[in-house]
Swiss-Prot record:
This is Endoribonuclease YbeY. It comes from Bdellovibrio bacteriovorus (strain ATCC 15356 / DSM 50701 / NCIMB 9529 / HD100). Binds 1 zinc ion. Zn(2+) binds at H112, H116, H122. It holds the Pfam family YbeY. Its main location: cytoplasm. The gene is ybeY.
Length: 150
């Protein structure tokens, strides 16, 4: 999967971590048969925004007037898996709340966003939420071990 990073925030995007993490995500989701080989060949765009623009997009597309950690947008381009919009300020705050490093929180939300792009939705039903978070948490545990081993 080719990952394009567009950083429009005042925070540096950890590009090397993102590239390594996303390679591991692809491998793990293919292993779990959640990601098809054809989907793994698509491009993924990551956009990093500061709080105000992230809040504006969240309001426009979800009707929620606050900046959120990650938003996912499907693509009409058959060569693209979609786009994830992330807010580093929210991720940094959440990492402290969750007892994770910033990169771990970013990794968790990248995984979360990719699952949304693959059709998983935790807001539709409790059963779907359990399925999505089950996949996400199990994959995250495996991925953390692989990243710390590198």
């Amino acid at each position: 999967m080719e990952v394009l990073i567009v950083n429009e925030s005042k925070h540096a995007a950890p590009r090397k971590f993102i590239q390594t993490w996303m390679q591991l995500v692809v491998t793990e989701l293919k292993r779990k048969k959640v990601l098809k080989a054809e989907q793994a060949r698509r491009e993924l765009t990551l956009v990093f925004l500061d709080k105000k623009p992230a809040q504006k997009i969240n309001m426009e597309f979800r009707g929620k007037n606050y900046a959120t950690d990650v938003l996912s947008f499907d693509s009409m381009d058959p060569g693209s898996l979609g786009e994830l919009v992330l807010c580093p300020e929210v991720l940094k705050r959440q990492s402290k709340e969750h007892g994770l490093t910033y990169q771990q929180e970013l990794g968790y939300m990248l995984l979360h966003g990719v699952l949304h792009l693959l059709g998983y939705d935790h807001e539709t039903s409790e059963a779907e939420a359990l399925e999505m978070f089950g996949i996400q948490d199990a994959a995250f545990e495996v991925l953390l071990k692989k990243v710390s081993a590198k």
